[in-house]
UniProtKB/Swiss-Prot annotation:
It comes from Xenopus laevis (African clawed frog). The chain crosses the membrane at residues 27-46, 47-67, 101-121, 124-144. InterPro entries: ORMDL (IPR007203). This is ORM1-like protein 1. Ceramide-sensitive subunit of the serine palmitoyltransferase (SPT) complex, which is also composed of SPTLC1, SPTLC2/3 and SPTSSA/B. Keywords: Endoplasmic reticulum, Membrane, Transmembrane, Transmembrane helix. GO terms for cellular component: endoplasmic reticulum membrane; serine palmitoyltransferase complex. Residues 122-123 are extracellular. It is found in: Endoplasmic reticulum membrane. Residues 1-26, 68-100, 145-153 are cytoplasmic. The gene is ormdl1. GO terms for biological process: ceramide metabolic process; intracellular sphingolipid homeostasis; regulation of ceramide biosynthetic process; sphingolipid biosynthetic process. It is a multi-pass membrane protein. Belongs to the ORM family. Ceramides bind to ORMDL3 N-terminus and stabilize it in a conformation that physically restricts the accessibility of the substrates to their binding sites in the serine palmitoyltransferase (SPT) complex, hence inhibiting SPT catalytic activity. In the absence of ceramides, the N-terminus is flexible and permits substrate binding, thus liberating SPT from inhibition.
Amino acid sequence: MNVGVAHSEVNPNTRVMNSRGMWLTYALGVGMLHIVLLSIPFFSVPVAWTLTNVIHNLGMYVFLHAVKGTPFETPDQGKARLLTHWEQLDYGVQFTSSRKFLTISPIILYFLASFYTKYDPTHFFINTASLLSVLIPKLPQLHGVRIFGINKY
């Protein structure tokens, strides 16, 4: 065991979704969230699916698109300080398998939520707005862009 030895990554945020078992853990976490919401007695199935979708997308937005920097002291001399986690992922390379997974997972959850809510207009609007709020920041054209200066510093 190498005690006191630093990791080999300059910025560990860049490779976290490529860790072994991370995708399975992510899917199990979403599944557990849904089971917990279904176990609440006064939530109907459509409400549980919509809440699962909204909570998932809210968490994804906060952790991937709102929080900037890195929790580690990195030797990159502050290059990651102004980047969101999404922009740091896979060293900023577009269309990697991790980015595709994180892009397709809210879409699959949206389809499931839409199906189980029987395309009710209220749920459909909420789920669509939630989906767009996490898909639009993932577009390659918005890499490093701060709309209206929000989250600039």
